[in-house]
């Protein structure tokens, strides 16, 4: 069964512009693009609104009948600037972390780094309102992802780039998001 005009869910951040440009300007390829934050990409794919998707890497293992379809990804070897932990004190003094709800992968990554690199065990909270950033208390840190980092990074004394922290801890690159399709879906 061929998908005549595929629906493609992709992240609506600056780092996907090369992918979006390629999809929109490939002369022989038509697709409906669904651009949204990472968590919404997953929802669009899971609920069947997208045939192909750029999904948070952390979401893929839980998706049945899904396969990674290319080596292209949103990944990094070193700093990315758009996936950060912000605080007014050093990470060793962090007691509470407020988590950006837009990326399951980044939430898992900061949890790994807290336990294995920084050796801290903070309390975890959802960052339900970005106004919370203005009311940080001593020991608070904020996981932010995407373009919104640019609006807030200068308001804090400490900024930990999670991709750089991952590489320092593991000596490996990090994949934040990968291209997937349902098994059996033609995608070339």
Task: Spell out what each predicted region is.
Residues 1-76, 92-93, 138, 165, ...:
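N-terminal hydrophobic or amphipathic helices and topogenic motifs
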Residues 11-13, 100-102, 145-147, 182-183:
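Structural motif
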Residues 15, 106, 110, 175:
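Catalytic-loop motifs flanking and including active-site residues across diverse enzymes
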Residues 22, 82-91, 96, 174-188:
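A bilobed periplasmic-binding-protein/Venus flytrap-type ligand-binding module shared by bacterial periplasmic
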Residues 22-25, 68, 112-113, 156-159:
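Short, glycine/charged-enriched secondary-structure capping and boundary segments
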Residues 53, 97, 142:
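Receiver (REC) domain switch-region micro-motif
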Residues 72-131, 160-167:
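A conserved helix-loop-strand patch within extracytoplasmic ligand-binding domains
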Residues 126-188:
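Pocket-lining segment of extracytoplasmic ligand-binding domains
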């Amino acid at each position: 069964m061929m998908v005549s005009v595929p629906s493609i869910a992709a992240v609506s951040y600056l780092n996907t512009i090369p992918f979006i440009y390629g999809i929109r300007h490939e002369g022989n390829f038509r697709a409906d693009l669904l651009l949204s934050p990472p968590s919404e990409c997953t929802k669009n794919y899971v609920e069947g609104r997208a045939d192909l998707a750029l999904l948070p890497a952390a979401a893929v293992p839980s998706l049945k009948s899904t396969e990674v379809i290319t080596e292209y990804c949103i990944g990094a070897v070193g700093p990315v600037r758009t996936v950060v932990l912000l605080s007014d004190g050093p990470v060793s003094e962090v007691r509470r972390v407020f988590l950006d709800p837009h990326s399951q992968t980044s939430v898992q990554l900061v949890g790994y780094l807290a336990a294995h690199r920084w050796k801290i065990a903070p309390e975890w909270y959802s960052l339900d309102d970005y106004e919370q950033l203005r009311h940080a208390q001593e020991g608070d840190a904020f996981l932010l992802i995407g373009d919104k980092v640019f609006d807030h990074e200068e308001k804090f004394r400490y900024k930990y780039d999670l991709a750089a922290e991952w590489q320092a801890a593991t000596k490996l690159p990090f994949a934040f998001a990968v291209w997937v399709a349902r098994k059996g879906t033609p995608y070339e």
